[in-house]
Amino acid sequence: LNEVEMSPRCYQAELLAACEARGVRVVGYSPYGTCWLAKYFPDFVPWPAASVLDDATVAAVAAEAGCTPAQACVAWAMAKGASPIPKSLDPERVRATARCLDDVALTADQVARLDALRDPRRGVEASLAAHARIIASPDYAWDPT
C-alpha cells in the first residue's frame, strides 16, 4: 500500500501510474482537499477555494452524476484505481459516502474534467507549515534525498 494525498486538485499522476505498474494499491487521503487549512490559515491556502467541494467543476460533475460533490470526489478517486479514505464526523455524511461505492459511477469525460483541476501545489507544504508555526522549522519536513 502507498498512502498519499489525493483529491482532484492534488494528486500525483506519475506516482499512480508507477504504483499500478508494480501492483501497489494506492490509498488516497483528503479526497475532498485539505480544507482544514483554510479555517486556521486562510491566507496560506494555495487554491482559490479551500475545499475541492467548493469548486464549480466538481459541483457540475456531481450534478450530472446525480450525487454530492463529496461523492463525486470519492468516485473520482476510485475511477483512478485508488481506495479513498475520506473523513467525516457526521454519521449521515459517512452513510452518504458509503452509498456512493455502489451508486455513483463517473464517465470518462467526467473523470477527465476532474483530472483537469490538478494543481502541482500540495495542500500542506513545508513553507506553509513553518510560516504558520505548525512546526518549528522546515528542517522537520520530510526530505527524500
Which role does the model predict for each range below?
Residues 1-145:
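Beta/alpha (TIM)-barrel catalytic core signal, keyed to glycine-rich beta->alpha loops juxtaposed to Asp/Glu
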